[in-house]
């Protein structure tokens, strides 16, 4: 299980680097899907199945809409790929930064970092994930509604930006 979680952590870092290096909106959307899937898999591995499902739906439902309309707005005839020199420079700087930060904090990263939610306490009556669900709908209900409203507002802003003169979102770029 530790090896599986380590591979998922490496996949999360690679997915986030694909989004941050941003060669083209097409590849950044692919990196976002990889990062969201692997990050939610990490949460499932640590015992947060409901939270990972909610985050996965928010990422794919909200952010991929933004990336789809960004790709429609910024359609390039020859998009940059991950093999271009500028993108490789960004990726190498990110890898060096991760290496030096990892080397600096290596001693503090040991210990309980691989322990799931249920392995910390033996006499709990409910799982840790279900306690989080209760807090999400009780105390965090306002933030849940606010987050949904912000995603809806973002969708309308992107639709308005890509609308064009009078052709709607199906205009020729």
From Swiss-Prot:
Top-level taxon of the source organism: Eukaryota
Catalytic activity reported: a ubiquinone + NADH + 5 H(+)(in) = a ubiquinol + NAD(+) + 4 H(+)(out)
Transport is among the record's keywords: yes
GO cellular component: mitochondrial membrane
Segments crossing the lipid bilayer: 1-21, 25-45, 53-73, 82-102, 141-161
EC number of this enzyme: 7.1.1.2
Name of the protein: NADH-ubiquinone oxidoreductase chain 6
Entries under Pfam families matching the protein: Oxidored_q3
Keyword Transmembrane: yes
């Amino acid at each position: 299980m530790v090896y599986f979680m380590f591979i998922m952590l490496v996949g999360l870092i690679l997915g986030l680097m694909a989004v941050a290096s941003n060669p083209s909106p097409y590849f950044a959307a692919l990196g976002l899907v990889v990062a969201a899937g692997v990050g939610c898999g990490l949460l499932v591995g640590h015992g947060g199945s409901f939270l990972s499902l909610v985050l996965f739906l928010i990422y794919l439902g909200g952010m991929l809409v933004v990336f789809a309309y960004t790709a429609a707005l910024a359609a390039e005839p020859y998009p940059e790929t991950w093999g271009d020199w500028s993108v490789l420079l960004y990726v190498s700087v990110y890898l060096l930064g991760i290496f030096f930060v990892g080397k600096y904090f290596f001693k503090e990263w040991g210990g309980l970092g691989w322990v799931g939610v249920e392995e910390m306490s033996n006499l709990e009556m409910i799982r840790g994930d279900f306690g989080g669900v209760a807090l999400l709908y009780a105390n965090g209900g306002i933030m849940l509604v606010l987050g949904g409203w912000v995603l809806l507002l973002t969708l309308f802003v992107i639709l308005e930006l890509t609308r064009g003169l009078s052709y709607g979102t199906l205009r020729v770029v």
